[in-house]
Curated annotation (Swiss-Prot):
The gene is mnmG2. It comes from Caldanaerobacter subterraneus subsp. tengcongensis (strain DSM 15242 / JCM 11007 / NBRC 100824 / MB4). InterPro entries: FAD/NAD-bd_sf, GIDA_C_N, MnmG, MnmG-rel, MnmG-rel_CS, MnmG_C, MnmG_C_subdom, MnmG_C_subdom_sf. One of its GO terms (molecular function) is flavin adenine dinucleotide binding. This is tRNA uridine 5-carboxymethylaminomethyl modification enzyme MnmG 2. It comes from the Bacteria. Keywords: Cytoplasm, FAD, Flavoprotein, NAD, tRNA processing. NAD(+) binds at residues 273-287. SUPFAM superfamilies: FAD/NAD(P)-binding domain (SSF51905). It is found in: Cytoplasm.
Length: 633
């Protein structure tokens, strides 16, 4: 029997990484919000790797933080180890990667949700979405409780009709032994949404006491920890190392000889898998010329013996997993605590969404996270934040927040999903960013914090911290060209020691800092008027902005061209089948996606440059016609 149990502005279904951010954003913007999880002990569950960040993902985390989200703050509070990746490369691809205590991460996020004003969290399985006149009006729990709402955000991750496969054994399940959400998947289909079936896999966890680390290569954290959150100046903890080992020909032979027992190869798994996170059987079969593959052994927490075997994702039966482990140096006697498994699940075709992550089909219904066909905690959290923000802004009667491709990786992620869709689990990559030199992890606050403040998500404390940094940077960038450096013996000895050419005449410090061998901090002795309180993060900005000035200016000019196309808006009521000259494929794709700008239309697969030219002419004629009609009236 159904009954009214409560009424809220926003209901969030699922409290993983997307759901947690969505619920917090909505509540922090003043909306009465309720979040549902099938198990409150699994909030922000790290069902796969116990880490946050990495290339492109770190940029997302920093952007979430700059807008006032929680992931970076929670990562810093749960840290085991921090490493900066790609340090030998340019700043565009440098990325933080944090190893975290996964249980502490969950506990900290639950603690944050429980104490958030305007937010209730409840343990319940949602089985139906109530819709009236194409508008969402509520959700229903398995026990019959109805929660009325003005907006609903679906963030169900891999739970929709989840099915776990380990070798010959397959059974209905969510990740990590949790219950799947079967009825909700059917409810979403009944509303008319097109569904897809994807899969992902996770490696075994082994007992630390059975691992021989003497046969592995230690992977320590950075000597000085760089916090993920802009709110934290420093973190001082005892870091726990990760370890590196390799597969070998023995490993590969076992896999080749038993490939008929891998469900990912036998057809037992029907979902489409992750391209950039392949199973070990995939790696061995697709790259036969490789004589070894990296295996990272990573801690899952400070107070557990479980170790995560990164690189050994698999759907093989447990006996074969044990045999494979026995061939790897250091893991010969490792005891499995949790076997590897593959999980397949339902997700929606994301082209059914607007750029706000609201569905085109049902007003007030939003989707975010892996249910949109993405992979990764960071991608999920970014979508959750944006869905929470936009659901709240819609209810408050305010304009939506849509970040474009030149503003943030978040903008690229959402634009790719709603414009191009995906036929496999989507992962964020730096190569997807056209303007990655200006979308760095180090400048996310400069790009987005003022936007976060404007919508009301950034706290006064965060904003004041940001302003101090911004003012310091602006003052230094103006002061440095006025500081003259003379070709003294001391100066030239310093330059020679750095592998740089000695000076023959005076030069300003701004120009000197353009040299790749010279960094801002090392020139303090040349600069007597330099303030003593310059932040490390400001020093980093100075070096990057000066050294890459030419490239940054070039990219900013490209952004201007991009913006020009984005600013050419397309009327909502346009009938593409009436646009003569468009190819049939373009008519079909444009009618399905309903792009809001010519720029977005140009990124749709199947829409050619010739189609865009036709569309531009049509829009010009349309505007002229409407202008003439307005004059007559």
């Amino acid at each position: 029997m159904r009954y009214i149990a409560g009424e809220y502005d926003v209901c969030v279904v699922g409290l993983g990484h997307a759901g947690s951010e969505a619920a917090l954003a909505s509540a922090r913007l003043g909306l009465a919000t309720v979040g549902f999880a099938t198990n409150l002990d699994a909030i922000a569950l790290m069902a796969c790797n116990p880490s946050i960040g990495g290339p492109a993902k770190a940029q997302l985390v920093r952007e979430i933080d700059a807008l006032g989200g929680e992931m970076a703050v929670n990562t810093d509070k749960s840290l085991l180890q921090m490493r900066t990746l790609n340090t030998s490369k340019g700043p565009a691809v440098r990325s933080l990667r944090a190893q975290v205590d996964k249980k502490l991460y969950q506990a900290n996020m639950k603690h944050t949700l429980e104490r958030q004003k305007n937010l209730d969290i409840k343990q319940a399985e949602i089985v139906d979405i109530l819709v009236e006149n194409n508008k969402v009006v509520g959700v229903v729990t398995k026990l019959g409780a109805i929660y009325k709402c003005k907006a609903c955000i679906i963030t169900t991750g891999t739970f929709l009709r989840g099915r776990v496969i380990i070798g010959e054994v397959g059974f209905e399940s969510g990740p990590s032994g949790l219950f799947p959400a079967k009825e909700l998947s059917e409810a979403i289909k009944r509303l008319g949404f097109k569904m897809m079936r994807f899969n992902t896999s996770t490696p075994p966890r082994v007992d630390k006491r059975t691992v021989d680390f003497s046969k592995m290569i230690m992977q320590p954290g950075d000597e000085v920890i760089t916090p993920f959150s802009f709110m934290h100046d420093k973190i001082e903890i005892e870091q726990i190392p990760c370890w590196l080992t390799y597969t070998n020909e023995k490993t590969h032979k076992i896999i080749r000889d038993n490939i008929h027992r891998a469900p990912l190869y036998t057809g037992e798994v029907e979902g489409v898998g992750v391209r950039y996170c392949p199973s070990i059987e995939d790696k061995v079969m697709k790259f036969p010329h490789r004589d070894r593959h990296q295996i990272f052994v990573e801690p899952e927490g400070r107070d557990t013996y479980e170790m995560y075997i990164q690189g050994l994702f698999s759907s093989f039966p447990e006996d074969l997993q044990m045999e494979i482990l026995s061939t790897i140096p250091g893991l010969e006697n490792a005891k499995i605590m949790r076997p590897a498994y593959a999980i397949e699940y339902d997700c929606i075709d994301p082209t059914q969404l607007k750029a706000t992550l609201e569905t085109k089909l049902v007003e007030g219904l939003y989707f975010a996270g892996q249910v949109n066909g993405t992979s990764g905690y960071e991608e999920a959290a970014a979508q959750g934040l944006m869905a929470g923000i936009n659901a709240a802004l819609k209810i408050l009667g305010k304009p939506p927040l849509i970040l474009d491709r030149s503003q943030a990786y978040i903008g690229i992620l959402i634009d790719d999903l709603v414009t191009k869709g995906t036929n496999e689990p989507y992962r964020m990559l730096t190569s997807r960013a056209e303007y990655r030199l200006i979308l760095r992890q180090d400048n996310a606050d400069f790009r987005l914090t003022e936007i976060g403040k404007e919508i009301g998500l950034v706290t006064e404390e965060r904003y004041e911290k940001f302003l101090r940094k911004k003012i310091q940077l602006e003052k230094e960038m103006m002061r440095l060209p006025t500081v003259m450096v003379r070709p003294t013996e001391e100066v030239n000895n310093f330059l020679i020691s750095r592998g740089s050419t000695p000076l023959v005449s005076g030069v300003d410090l701004y120009t000197l800092l353009k040299r790749p061998e010279i960094d801002y901090k090392s020139t303090k002795f040349l600069d007597p008027t330099r303030p003593d309180d310059i932040l490390d993060s400001v020093a980093e900005q100075i070096d990057i902005n000066i050294k890459y000035e030419g490239y940054i200016l070039k990219q900013l000019r490209q952004v201007e061209q991009f913006k020009a196309m984005e600013n050419k808006k397309i009327p909502e009521d346009i009938d593409y089948y009436q646009v003569h000259g468009l190819s049939n494929e373009a008519k079909e794709k444009l009618s399905k996606i309903r792009p809001t700008s010519v720029g977005q239309a140009s990124r749709i697969s199947g829409v050619s440059p010739a189609d865009i030219s036709v569309l531009l002419i049509y829009l010009q004629q349309m505007r002229r016609k409407r202008s003439d009609e307005a004059k007559i009236n």
